[in-house]
Amino acid sequence: MAAAPATLALDPQPQEKQKDASESSELSRLRAELAGALAEMETMKAVAEVSESTKAEAVAAVQRQCQEEVASLQAILKDSISSYETQIAALKQERQQQQQDFEEKDRELGHLKQLLARAHPLDSLEKQMEKAHEDSEKLREIVLPMEQEITELKGKLQRAEELIQEIQRRPRQPASLHGSTELLPLSRNPSPPLEPLEEPSGDAGPAAEAFAHNCDDSASISSFSLGGAAGSASLRGPQGLSPEQEETASLVSTGTLVPEGIFLPPPGYQLVPDSQWEQLQVEGRQLQKELESVSRERDELQEGLRRSNEDCAKQMQVLLAQVQNSEQLLRTLQGTVSQAQERVQLQMAELATSHKCLSQEVKRLNEENQGLRAEQLPSSALQGSEQREDQDEALPSSIQELHLLVQNTRQQARARQQAQEHEAERLRIEIVKLREALDEETAAKASLERQLRVQREETDVLEASLCSLRIETERVQQEQRKAQLTDLLSEQRAKTLRLQAELETSEQVQRDFVRLSQALQVRLERIRQAETLQQVRSILDEAPLRDIRDIKDS
């Protein structure tokens, strides 16, 4: 009976030991879980710190890249603007230079025209031609009265011949013969042999005096012939006609040869011998052939000149159209450049706005990061103090408290892990957005660079075409000016040659008139100095003076 209670008293001790052992094992397990949770928490803290540092580095890198891109775009824009301004200034200067060149060339053309006018003194030739025409008109004024006097003398001689024939037909009527012979002085007295002509001017020269003297001589011969015939008829009328009267009548009848033998060429014509006339005809035919060939060559040259002028006009039209197209393209390019500058400015403004937003976002993220760090530091400090207190203090006395502590620790670790995951996800989203914005900005920069490069190439091409067009325009203008000067020079030369030929012709006509008048004067003087009627008849029977050949032959 005593042994049984002793066994009953010893039985609770092993149970308590077993219970303590199980609790200690449970506690060690919980402590291990707590240590694992704390280690996991530390790992999560390290991951959070690494993610924060990575986020800060990524944001800083993105910010630096954005700043570099903005700076490069600004530099490119400044370079393009300065280059465009330089090109515009160069084009303006070149345009002013071209205007100055055009003005200078116009002045040179005027100076050349003045020199050409001075080199070809056509005024003096025209004055000489006018003087020659005046001389010919004056000579014509002298010759016309002489011709009238000659016609009057012919009429008088014809009337005298009629009277002589009437006397010869009626030799036995002395009264009527005497009356008819008395009519001769009556018919001669109303009109004198020659009226005094107008005094020739000094410009007419000796030709006018020679013609006037010639006219007086011819009139005196006719009056002498008529007077002699009338006197002989009046003296020997009752006795009939003697041989001397017949000779006088024949002399009177042949006296008409003197005015009839004088051939005065019409104005503008020249007296030439037959051989010279044939030679002149041959030369005229040759000159006609040469003139035809020259006219054909001139027509061909005119046709070529017309074609060249048409080609030049077409080229000028094409060049002007090309210049207008180039100017229009230049204006279009300037508009495109201005639009590109406006777009770049808008993009710069957008980039500045986005940069400002990114800086604000980075600032906000930094503030949040600092807040999180501030939250983590008190929590970690609180946890460290709690751990130290827990370590200092005794462990929970009961398993339920230990379970509660473990559950709370797990919940806190899970909440922190979720918060860190959310933060990491948000940071990843922000990084992706920043990368997308950076890619868009890079693509925009690349497109702007491509547009700028294309515009520069187009500007270079347009400048080259404009330069070539200007060179071609200057060449065509020089050719046109040269052709105009050549035409003007040829016209002036032709005019000079024509005026010289007319002057030589007028001088030759004047010389021929003078020689003819001198020859007539010499023959009249010979008639005046003749002593017998036979000498007068021989002089009158000589070859009539019809042209210059007769003068040369005589």
From Swiss-Prot:
The biased composition feature labelled Basic and acidic residues covers: 14-28
Q: What is its main location?
A: cytoplasm
InterPro entries to which the protein is assigned, alphabetical:
Rabaptin (IPR003914), Rabaptin_coiled-coil (IPR018514), Rabaptin_Rab5-bd_dom (IPR015390)
Instruction: Return the annotated region ranges for Disordered.
Output: 1-28, 167-208, 371-395
Chain's role:
Plays a role in membrane trafficking and in homotypic early endosome fusion. Participates in arteriogenesis by regulating vascular endothelial growth factor receptor 2/VEGFR2 cell surface expression and endosomal trafficking. By interacting with SDCCAG8, localizes to centrosomes and plays a critical role in ciliogenesis.
Protein known as: Rab GTPase-binding effector protein 2
Localisation: Cytoplasm; Early endosome; Cytoplasm, Cytoskeleton, Microtubule organizing center, Centrosome; Cytoplasm, Cytoskeleton, Cilium basal body
- Entries under Pfam families matching the protein: Rab5-bind, Rabaptin
**Species of origin:** Mus musculus
* Keyword Coiled coil recorded: yes
Highest taxon of source:
Eukaryota
Note whether Coiled coil occurs among the keywords.
yes
Gene Ontology MF term list: growth factor activity; GTPase activator activity
Biological process according to GO: cell projection organization; endocytosis; protein transport; regulation of cilium assembly
- Residue ranges annotated as coiled coil are 15-173, 274-509
**Family membership:** Belongs to the rabaptin family.
Extent of the signal sequence:
none
Alphabetically sorted, this entry's keywords are: Cell projection, Cilium biogenesis/degradation, Coiled coil, Cytoplasm, Cytoskeleton, Endocytosis, Endosome, Phosphoprotein, Protein transport, Transport
Gene field: Rabep2
Query: Where is the PTM Phosphoserine found along the chain?
Result: S176, S180, S187, S191
Q: Whom does it interact with, and what assembly results?
A: Heterodimer with RABGEF1. The dimer binds RAB5A that has been activated by GTP-binding. Interacts with SDCCAG8; this interaction is important for ciliogenesis regulation. Interacts with RAB4A; this interaction may mediate VEGFR2 cell surface expression.
Query: GO cellular component annotations, sorted alphabetically?
Result: centrosome; ciliary basal body; cytosol; early endosome; Golgi apparatus
